[in-house]
């Protein structure tokens, strides 16, 4: 018993030191790469590091620790596909996206920019949890860090889109779940017919003891309760506060250009979108898939080797391409693994050889780590 308790405490302590975290680096619109967006000159409100938020009552749950307007805003229309691209260190092919041990759900919220910045008006528009034995994070890694949503048929204006990962590798204890999120600045240019629901407050939508947050992924289970409100069904009205099921499939809002929202791999394509000049203030903010009447579909598809053909050309409210000035931790993608980095475990595909003087310690079937010998 003592040995088991010590092992769990050691795992919890060591995991805090592991730079196996993740952030959103870029966004694609209708399969067109919008370029690196995680800097003050970009379109993502990015934190200075890829560390998680663990206190569900913190104001940092809204848009992470850097909830300030950035220089650019992406322009979209109802029915457009927005793809979020997550990475551990960089957009390089060798990047491991997020540690394979960090299993859990992926959710996407949206809110009007002014209300969302203040932590209010957040409406869940997509989610993926645990389906047929596969976690959403596992699908994300297979899809090279990409998952997508469809822009609802809402009124024109500026919005924040908030993709979120909840890593549950320490979810067996209260306060152990890790939350990764950023806010992407988006301007909807089409005039939609649907009224966005009132939404929920973030922080406020979760508690540390919610069934989908205080959750032991190492126990035997057949289903997983995704925390937070239900996915919006696309109709005008109020947002429900009830918990969602493991996966969602809801009617899509009517739009002139309906498109499915799916967690899918996107063929790489250079950023060739048009751009316009638009000042920013602190207070203002393909790969072809079959058409379906669903806000979210979590079926993974095989990656394509041919460049995708975008259905529309999106615009960024700036003429300059964003450059990344956000500090990032060093990568351990190739060669010997550095201290505190992952070196093995179920579904892990990276190097298993630790640097000299280190040994690959097995904490549990899902997570092995390089520590001092």
Swiss-Prot record:
Its EC number is 1.14.99.56. Residues 36-55, 234-333 are annotated as: Disordered. Its main location: secreted. Cu(2+) binds at residues 21, 102, 180. Glycans are attached at residue 347. Induction: Expression is up-regulated on steam-exploded bagasse as carbon source compared to glucose. One of its GO terms (cellular component) is extracellular region. Residues 235-262, 270-323 have a biased composition (Low complexity). It catalyses: [(1->4)-beta-D-glucosyl]n+m + reduced acceptor + O2 = 4-dehydro-beta-D-glucosyl-[(1->4)-beta-D-glucosyl]n-1 + [(1->4)-beta-D-glucosyl]m + acceptor + H2O. Residues 1-20 form the signal peptide. Its cofactor is Cu(2+). Disulfide bonds join 63-183. Binds 1 copper ion per subunit. Coiled coil: none annotated. Lignocellulose is the most abundant polymeric composite on Earth and is a recalcitrant but promising renewable substrate for industrial biotechnology applications. Together with cellobiose dehydrogenases (CDHs) an enzymatic system capable of oxidative cellulose cleavage is formed, which increases the efficiency of cellulases and put LPMOs at focus of biofuel research. Residues 324-333 have a biased composition (Polar residues). Keywords: Carbohydrate metabolism, Cellulose degradation, Copper, Disulfide bond, Glycoprotein, Metal-binding, Monooxygenase, Oxidoreductase, Polysaccharide degradation, Secreted, Signal. One of its GO terms (biological process) is cellulose catabolic process. InterPro entries: AA9, AA9_LPMO, CBD_sf, Cellulose-bd_dom_fun. Residues 335-371 form the CBM1 domain. Belongs to the polysaccharide monooxygenase AA9 family. PANTHER family: ENDO-BETA-1,4-GLUCANASE D, PUTATIVE (AFU_ORTHOLOGUE AFUA_1G12560)-RELATED. Lytic polysaccharide monooxygenase (LPMO) that depolymerizes crystalline and amorphous polysaccharides via the oxidation of scissile alpha- or beta-(1-4)-glycosidic bonds, yielding exclusively C4 oxidation products. Catalysis by LPMOs requires the reduction of the active-site copper from Cu(II) to Cu(I) by a reducing agent and H(2)O(2) or O(2) as a cosubstrate. In addition to cellulose, also cleaves the beta-(1!4)-glucan backbone of tamarind xyloglucan, but only next to unsubstituted glucosyl units. Has a modular structure: an endo-beta-1,4-glucanase catalytic module at the N-terminus, a linker rich in serines and threonines, and a C-terminal carbohydrate-binding module (CBM). The CBM domain is essential for binding to and subsequent oxidative degradation of polysaccharide substrate. This is AA9 family lytic polysaccharide monooxygenase A. It comes from Aspergillus tamarii.
